[in-house]
C-alpha cells in the first residue's frame, strides 16, 4: 500500500512537531487494521482556531472550533478505475484545540494528535460515532486497538 500525504501546516507549534514519516505510519496502521489495502491519498491541514471555527460553522453548523474535521472524497464510481490512488479525503486538525485538549486530558500533544488522526481517518473510511451508540462503541474500540499498535495508551481511560 502506498500512501500519498499532502500536509499543509498553516498553523505550527513548537509543542507539536509533525513528521511526515510518523503521520504516514499512523495512517497506514489505521488502514491496515481495518483491512484497507489500496494505494490512497489523504490531505491533512493544520489550522488555527479561527479557521477551524469557520469550517465547523459552515459544514456542521457548530459555532465553535473543533479538534478534527473530516471531509471524505466524493469521487464518482466511473472515475475510480482511472486513478492510480484513491483519494480518501481531507482532514482539518486545529492545533490549538489539540494542545488545549492534551493539556486538559493530561496526554502528550503527540499522542493526542495521533488519536485524532486515527479518528479522522476512520471517518474518511465511513465510520461514524454520531449515528448510534453501537457505532460509537465500534469506532472507539477500533481507535483503542489501533493506538495500542502504536504504543499509545487507551485515550478513553482516565
Curated annotation (Swiss-Prot):
Record flagged with keyword Nuclease: yes
UniProt xrefs under Gene3D superfamilies: Metalloproteases ('zincins'), catalytic domain
This protein's GO CC annotations: cytoplasm
SUPFAM superfamilies: Metalloproteases ('zincins'), catalytic domain
InterPro entries for this protein: MetalPrtase_cat_dom_sf_prd, YbeY, YbeY_CS
Keywords: Cytoplasm, Endonuclease, Hydrolase, Metal-binding, Nuclease, Ribosome biogenesis, rRNA processing, Zinc
Subcellular location: Cytoplasm
PROSITE patterns: UPF0054 (PS01306)
Gene Ontology molecular function, alphabetical: metalloendopeptidase activity; RNA endonuclease activity; zinc ion binding
Tree of life domain: Bacteria
Protein EC: 3.1.-.-
Pfam family for this entry, one: YbeY
Cofactor dependency: Zn(2+)
GO BP, sorted A to Z: rRNA processing
NCBIfam families, sorted: rRNA maturation RNase YbeY
Function in brief: Single strand-specific metallo-endoribonuclease involved in late-stage 70S ribosome quality control and in maturation of the 3' terminus of the 16S rRNA.
Protein name: Endoribonuclease YbeY
Naturally occurring in which organism (per UniProt): Acinetobacter baumannii (strain ATCC 17978 / DSM 105126 / CIP 53.77 / LMG 1025 / NCDC KC755 / 5377)
